[in-house]
Each structure stands twice: as structure tokens, then as C-alpha cells.
């Protein structure tokens, strides 16, 4: 597992071709993945979604893996009874239009150190998480994949409680 994650991180998995994908199709893929991950852990998921238009030029496999990493982290850290909230929308950020996929959990949120280092390779937060299941690569890989597609990964603490991770994928002008 760790070797596979390292190969993904360092670009040894580049066989997939870039393609034009509608934002509506990507939204459905993101929704389906979030439902599957949440259902596997018996965690409720609430969706807030806008009508999406336009296209993104991306490698769907890596973008999907980035999304699954983000959702898996949220499911792992949330209050299991409250679940997660997924928001899918179009957004203009710094003058560029993006397909934005946001996941909010209801856990303890990010520590100050997490906010600085969470997307860095091999960072896994507190010492209690240094085990076989946490290699500190998930958010680093998600950030790398999104950046390669002209996007970005941002994370915050929600004003009320929990963490919020935002995946932005640049849309094409139509």
C-alpha cells in the first residue's frame, strides 16, 4: 500500500490521458464516491448541490482519487452520528471559475499545526496516528493531483465545528 501511494505521489502513475469532462458528470462521480465511502462506514452524508455547467480538462482517475482521499479523511474524523456534508458548486475564486467540491466533517477540526502541514508528505498529525493505516500521504496526493489539473486543495476549520476541505478544479471557458 505504502509503495503504491509513493508511486502516485511521485508521478509513476501517469498513464491516464487528459480528457474533457462535463462538470455535471464529475459532480455525479463525486456524489457516488462520497455515498459509497460514507455507506461503508455507516456515516450519514448530506448533499448541497447547485446546477453545474461547463467542462473541466482533467485526468478523471487522479481527480477521483483526490476526492476519495478527502472524503475518506472526513468520514474518519467526523462525529459518526452527525456524518459529513458535501457541497458541489461552481465558484469564482481569484478571478477564475472552478468546480468546487467541499467536504465538512463534525470532528475536532484541524489543529494549528494541521492547518500548516496537513497537505505535506508524511505529515499525519498527532503521534497517536502513527500506525499502518496513516502514512500521511492522502492529502499530499490530493493536493498534487488537483494542482496538476489546474486546481487546488484548501482546508479550514468550520466556524461552528469540525473541519472543511475544499477541492477546486479549474473549468474551461465555453
Q: Which residues does each PLM region occupy?
A:
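Conserved DHp (HisKA) dimerization/phosphotransfer helix of two-component histidine kinases, i.e.
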Residues: 1-37
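Short helix-loop "hinge" at the ATP-lid/N-box region of the Bergerat-fold HATPase_c
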Residues: 73-75
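Short conserved segment of the HATPase_c
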Residues: 110-123
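Conserved glycine-rich
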Residues: 150-152
